[in-house]
Amino acid sequence: MGRLGGALGLALQTKRWPVRIHSRTNEGRERAESLGLKTAAPADLKRARVILLCVPDAAVPAVAQALSTTLPRTAALVHTAGALSLDALGTAKGRSRGSFHPLCAVSSPRDSLVGSTVAVSTPSRTLREVLRHMAADAGLRVIEVPEAHRAAYHAGAVLSAGGLVSLADAAVAALGAAGIPPTDALAALLPLMHSALRGLETRGLAGGLTGPIVRGDSGVVAAHLEALPADVAPLYRLLSRRALGLAGDRLEPTSRAALERLLKPSG
């Protein structure tokens, strides 16, 4: 049993859902029991209405295939992977399939899911209502993701989390060019990043924008491009062009034109 399975299990058990955890390993069963979650033997799965596959993405097809050979068609299969289509659960007629992907980083099974969002996808109206009820009881906000656009949705999720870490790495490299050690650089940048996220939360994308782009300060931007490491400058250009779009009509035409010239992709 992994961290997400534990977190979902605890959240739903608190709301009196009849949760059972099935794990192939003694270690997984012991982890579930240590959290106060009840475990299920393979035979118990035949009585389940909904089975959530909280397994690594690569394991979903094989696990779904193994379950499909033993479960009645009345048991719905639901994976928790962000990028996988429902076809990863098999294509047997008569079985409801769905996905339930919480948009949160779960570092411990005891982490609260309250306030996060979950992406739900299923062609079954009945299963959709069950998953929405499940989300509400876990304190999750629901968005529905069309199956055809799952890759774009998941890419956006990755950009907001792993992409943010990569952006922090680039910022640390920029401070490194000024002679600041990586540990000190990250410690200096984290409060700034937190304040930027708070501004984003309270004022939205355009309102949360700060820095030389929104001020139209092409001189500062030119100095930045001159000083940045060669592998960071292209990222700075790309993100600054996005910032130009967010700045909108707050920039005077002459300032915008000067920035656009500076921010053209090099080469």
Where are the regions a protein language model picked out?
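Short, basic/aromatic-enriched C-terminal tail that caps enzymatic domains
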Residues: 31, 104, 250-267
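Rossmann-like NAD(P)(H) cofactor-binding subdomain of soluble oxidoreductases
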Residues: 26-29, 39-111
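Internal alpha-helical scaffold of NAD(P)-dependent oxidoreductase catalytic cores
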Residues: 31-33, 94, 111-202
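Interdomain hinge/lid region at the active-site interface
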Residues: 198-255, 267
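NAD(P)+-binding Rossmann beta1-loop-alpha1 motif at the extreme N-terminus of oxidoreductases
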Residues: 1-47
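Short, hydrophobic beta-strand segments that form beta-sheet elements in well-ordered domains
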Residues: 18-23, 77-80, 118
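Residues at the starts of beta-strands that form the adenosine-phosphate
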Residues: 18-20, 96, 141
